[in-house]
């Protein structure tokens, strides 16, 4: 069964030779377990030999077995382009599961690093450890995707506690700031890219989302400043505001069907975004060569719900 890679068709019997050739051309290590793994599912090979840090990149799946979180969807999208990945999160088991699946399926290298940016932690040291491990393992950083965020949803401003507010600010705004700052010298060397994550909660002031919205709008401001400061260094920094079908929404629908109907609305597109194909692929493009001129922008991926003047 033939498949395409960089515009060429390869039959399975030629895949081993092709894999060896690509390894020599682009300097990546072949997967010992599968010499054709680097070709399987590869789109254009945009990130072969490059390194991407993805926060919140642990594995999550839907009931049908497909990717069930935005972070894992982004993992897959970059793996299909041949990127080596540094994935972070608090849950070691989910990180290790992502590593196992991605390496087996796509032949890329994945470095999982437990990282918890929260109140009471030495957050600079936590983030610096991620950067140091990335450089020690791969020698370069080409893109940083700041996806991870925790928050207390459904709590009004009047009822919000400082602990709840800090949860959102530390895990979102502070984490994004620290990953950007610590990665900057390496991104400058590679003329890399940053994609940060914001939300319609901030754009439209969603009820019960005060700390989450505040963190996300802070991230948008930080992104615009970075676009101006780092543009001359060849680094572009953009924002994605996604709406996607995730395991969390699937579980919410199963557990509270009436609440789901009342609070989760179908976008005009008629479906919720696919975390890999409709969110992850856009993130890949924002970090790729064709979108280097896009800088400081907010991209809403909400199937028509995120329309703004």
Whereabouts are the PLM-identified features?
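Substrate-binding pocket helix/loop in short-chain dehydrogenase/reductase
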Residues: 155-157, 161-166, 260-263
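Canonical Rossmann dinucleotide-binding motif of NAD(H)/NADP(H)-dependent dehydrogenases/reductases
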Residues: 45-86
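Active-site helix of classical SDR
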Residues: 180, 215, 223
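Catalytic Tyr-x(3-8)-Lys segment
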Residues: 116-118, 257-277
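Residue(s) in the substrate-gating loop at a strand-loop-helix junction
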Residues: 199
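Short C-terminal tail/terminal secondary-structure segment
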Residues: 61-63, 154, 204, 265-266, ...
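Short, small/polar-rich loop/turn modules that mediate ligand/substrate recognition or access, typified
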Residues: 231, 236, 294-296
């Amino acid at each position: 069964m033939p498949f395409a890679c960089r515009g060429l068709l390869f039959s399975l019997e030629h895949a081993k030779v092709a894999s060896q050739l690509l390894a020599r051309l682009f300097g990546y290590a072949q997967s010992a377990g599968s010499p054709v793994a680097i070709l399987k599912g590869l789109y254009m090979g945009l990130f072969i030999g490059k390194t991407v840090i993805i926060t919140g990149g642990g594995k999550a799946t839907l009931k049908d077995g497909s990717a069930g979180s935005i972070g894992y969807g982004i993992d897959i999208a970059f793996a299909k382009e041949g990127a080596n990945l540094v994935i972070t999160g608090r849950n070691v088991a989910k990180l290790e599961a992502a590593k196992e699946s991605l390496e087996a399926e796509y032949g890329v290298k994945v470095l999982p690093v437990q990282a918890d940016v929260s109140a009471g932690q030495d957050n600079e040291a936590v983030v610096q450890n991620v950067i140091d491990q990335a450089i020690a393992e791969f020698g370069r950083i080409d893109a940083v995707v700041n996806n991870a965020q925790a928050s207390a949803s459904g709590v009004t401003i009047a009822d919000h506690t400082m602990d709840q507010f800090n949860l959102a600010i530390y895990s979102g705004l502070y984490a994004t700031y620290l990953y950007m700052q610590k990665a900057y010298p390496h991104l400058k060397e590679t003329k890399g890219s940053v994609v940060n994550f914001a939300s319609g909660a901030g754009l439209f002031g969603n009820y019960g989302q005060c700390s989450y919205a505040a963190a996300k709008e802070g991230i948008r401001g930080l992104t615009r400043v970075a676009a101006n400061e780092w543009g001359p260094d060849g680094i572009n920094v953009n924002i994605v505001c996604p709406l996607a079908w995730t395991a969390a929404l699937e579980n919410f629908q199963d557990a509270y069907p009436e609440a789901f109907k009342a609070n989760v609305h179908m976008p005009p597109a008629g479906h919720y975004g696919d975390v890999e194909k409709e969110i992850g692929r856009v993130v890949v493009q924002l970090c790729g060569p064709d979108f280097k001129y896009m800088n400081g922008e907010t991209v809403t991926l909400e199937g028509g719900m995120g329309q703004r003047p």
